[in-house]
Amino acid sequence: MSKSFVNKVLVGGALAAGAAVWAIAPRTFSDKRRNYVPAVPDVWYAHRGLHDAGSGLTAQYASESGEYVALARRMAMKAGYGSPSVVGAIAPENSLAAFAAACEAGYGIELDLQMTADGEIVVVHDGDLMRVAGDPRRVADLTYDELTRIPLFPTDAPGAAVAAPLSGSLEKPPLVTTPDSAPDGYFQHVPLFADVLKVVAGRVPLIVEYKFDDNSKWGPRDVELMEKGDALLQAYSGAYVIESFNPAAVNWYKENRPEVCRGQLSWWPQGEEKPSDPAALAKDYAAGALIFDWISRPDFVAYDWHGGNSPQVRLARFMGAVPVSWTVRSRDELAQCDDWFDHHIFEAFVPDER
């Protein structure tokens, strides 16, 4: 092996390493100082609010989730939602009751923004309502008025992770229609983001996630979501930070609202969640390696808690990015990842006070 070949390999390796460092680098300290960017508030963040039905409440976490569900119901009732006579869910995920419960308990809140067919900004995680309401229709195809007549977890007991399918929801095509009027009795529905902000009213900090159908694309409807969501936040006086899996969304804040603390969401593809399409998988691996951070130059990296000890997260942290975990669902998971993250998004267990 010639000396010149070895030199070329060393130079090539150094260039590749330098390119990786450049790509992963977060926003610079001087840019933060120039724009008076606030830090991520140091609190526990309740994933989709403090909820008694929805995300994370699976059999795997049943040993600790009972205490969590009971707390969610107590805090929701303390805030004026539901009553002991309500046998079903009082505070389902991403509902006004769940957010009010989190405020009563003193937890920060992580929530998700999408846009309805009539251009309203609402808080809901999935692209459709199947998991949370048993209705397979897409949020983007429904008006907000329709959403107010579709109860979240309408027939499910507290602690349910998935809503029971509505009649006709499993047909091909689905035979579900929106009722003419809202059901009788207590229920929660997908809320307007504006109403969520009124309920929270600055009592606890927010992590606001912008959701998209495809995180590798960017179109007029995506821009509309950004502009409308940001307009609501600009009028809000409470503490918040923003995040997204889509680097273009985080870049939107870099270009338009540099004073806002911004975060890049990511994870390392694994198991059944890996896409089967090779091109999509390659994009996911690149995103998981934080290679697209050069687009967004985030202040924090919100990463799947399993990946806190990964080289890319450790490098981003070394260069100044604040690591935030998602979603921690037990004390055991917290113990496994606590050393690698500064802040945690949690559900399904009650964490100790910070």
Residue ranges and their predicted role:
Residues 2-354:
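Phosphate-group recognition and catalysis centered on beta-loop-alpha active-site segments
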